[in-house]
A protein has these predicted regions:
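Residue-level recognition of pore/gate-forming positions within transmembrane alpha-helices
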Residues: 15, 52-53, 80-84, 124-125, ...
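Membrane-helix boundary/linker segments in multi-pass transporters
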Residues: 21-40, 94-105, 114-115, 264-282
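Membrane-interface "cap" regions at the ends of multi-pass membrane proteins
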Residues: 1-59, 166-169
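Helix-loop-helix module between adjacent transmembrane segments
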Residues: 18-19, 51, 74-169, 223-235, ...
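Alpha-helical transmembrane segments of polytopic integral membrane proteins
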Residues: 26-27, 56-59, 63, 88, ...
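Loop-to-helix junctions at membrane interfaces in multi-pass transport proteins
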Residues: 2, 38-40, 44, 61-75, ...
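Membrane-helix boundary/coupling elements in multi-pass transport proteins
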Residues: 123-141, 335, 339-344, 352-360, ...
Length: 457
């Protein structure tokens, strides 16, 4: 059975589950349609809110951010989870207390101002539009890779799916569908991570595997990762951030932004009591933490596996030939999310930190072709080459390398991780279903916000 067929089966079964739940939990009253009757249990609502929050950004991009940024990227974990502490303490109970269906209704009633309510509508539309673009883009990326369709086609399929179960079931249907999506995305995220953790460290718990020894090297896996990335000219994975104040302020910004996300806030209208709103925030944090506990391990191990793929004999030896690249790399090249440019025409894939040399070389080529400022582009190339030589004692230049030749979009690392690690085809199909569940769950929440805006206005 082909990988495409397996992907279709997993995605098709997950969609059938969502449609079935939407039909089973369809709204019977206006209250059920808009706020699920106001009777959703905090645990159920916490799971639905977690799915609503763990969008394509968390499922698809989070581990990629950690893989690229290392310790410095942990601000995203702290900020996004810390936002729920603010939400539980300062917002959630009061939203439920006023008993309004929408955030602008709450703002207008709380401040006795229609102007304030209108400003809230405008802010909500701006935030929602920006956020939903990312979710639908994530769905398009997942569809284009796993179902082998164009990005635009993937976006349209996602929109139809969301429209169907949102309109049919209302907020009640969305709530229970998002519970199912949470289960799907957590299974899809965790199972590949368990396989990879076992393969690299022998520990079945990815979060603990991150602090275990590498099976082959016999040293802690983070030590192994630090060694290979620094040998390639990158900053050590566990390197401290140079400016702690920036890190703190960035974390606070993420916390405040998380607490104010409109598609998350609206979920606190669906519980029976004010106390349940606070409990919902607590349970949401628990369910989100289950994924975020695994994300650092997924990111670190994905980066190590990617480097091992390019340098199978170790980073001190020659990289693989482009013609011998694995099938998963060929597939992702078709999506445009992996790009290769043979700068020195040796047929091999040089992936390293070239201090911007590769980008400067491309800019010089473009300037020569388009009649641009060739002198400035040439100077930029020389500056980058000097910086590279100073940093790495000219090792790469001496080897004949002329710049980094492989550009890997960090957003693909979670989706490509099972393929990079040579996991079974059914695991790849499972993560396809999980990636789509993550993108669709948040898209449904934002569709509902737009629908409420149209009803309100």
């Amino acid at each position: 059975m082909s990988q495409f067929t397996i992907n279709i089966i997993f995605v098709g079964l997950s969609f059938a589950l969502y449609f079935g739940i939407a039909i089973w939990a369809r709204a019977g009253t206006t209250s059920e349609f808009y706020v699920a009757g106001g009777g959703v249990h905090p645990v159920v609502n916490g799971m639905a809110t977690a799915a609503d929050w763990m969008s394509a950004a968390s499922f698809i991009s989070m581990a990629g951010i950690l893989a690229a940024g290392g310790y410095g990227a942990s601000t995203y974990l702290m900020g996004w989870t810390g936002g729920y502490v603010l939400l539980a303490m300062l917002l959630a109970p009061y939203l439920r207390k006023f008993g309004k269906f929408t955030v602008p209704d709450f703002i207008g009633d709380r401040f006795y101002s229609k102007t304030a309510a209108m400003i809230a509508v405008i802010c909500l539309i701006i935030a929602s539009t920006t956020y939903v673009i990312g979710q639908m883009t994530g769905a398009g990326v997942a569809f284009s890779r796993f179902l082998e369709v164009e990005n635009t086609t993937g976006l349209l399929i996602a929109a139809v799916v969301v429209f169907f179960y949102a309109v049919l079931g209302g907020m009640k249907g969305i709530t229970y569908t998002q519970v199912a999506q949470y289960v799907v995305l957590m299974i899809a995220y965790t199972i590949p991570a368990v396989f990879i953790s076992l393969e690299l460290t022998g520990n079945p718990i990815p979060g603990l595997g991150l602090f275990s020894n590498h099976v082959e090297a016999g040293v802690p896996i983070l030590t192994k990762l630090d060694q290979v990335v620094t040998d390639l000219g990158f900053t050590a994975y566990t390197a401290d951030v140079p400016n702690k104040l920036n890190m703190v302020l960035f974390t606070l910004s993420l916390m405040i932004g998380t607490a104010g996300l409109p598609h998350v806030i609206i979920r606190f209208f669906t519980v029976p009591k004010v106390a349940d709103a606070r409990w919902t925030a607590g349970w949401t944090l628990v369910f989100i933490s289950l994924l975020y506990f695994t994300a650092p391990a997924v990111g670190a191990m994905a980066r190590l596996n990617l480097i091992d793929t390019i340098y199978p004999q170790g980073v001190a030896e020659a990289p693989i030939n482009y013609d011998q690249r694995p099938d998963w790399m060929k597939t992702w090249e078709d999506t445009g999310l992996i790009k290769y440019n043979d700068l020195n025409n040796d047929g091999r894939i040089q992936m390293y930190n070239d201090s911007g040399l590769g980008a400067a070389e491309l800019a010089l080529t473009a300037a020569q072709a388009d009649g641009g400022d060739v002198a400035a582009a040439t100077a930029a190339v020389e500056t980058a080459r000097v910086a590279q030589d100073l940093e790495l004692n000219g090792r790469f230049t001496a080897a004949g390398w002329k710049g980094n030749e492989l550009d890997v979009n960090a957003d693909i690392l979670v989706l490509a991780n099972p393929e990079i690690a040579n996991l079974p085809p059914w695991v790849i199909g499972l993560i396809a279903a999980g990636g789509l569940a993550a993108a669709l769950s948040t898209a449904a929440g934002y569709y509902w916000l737009f629908r409420q805006r149209s009803v309100m206005t």
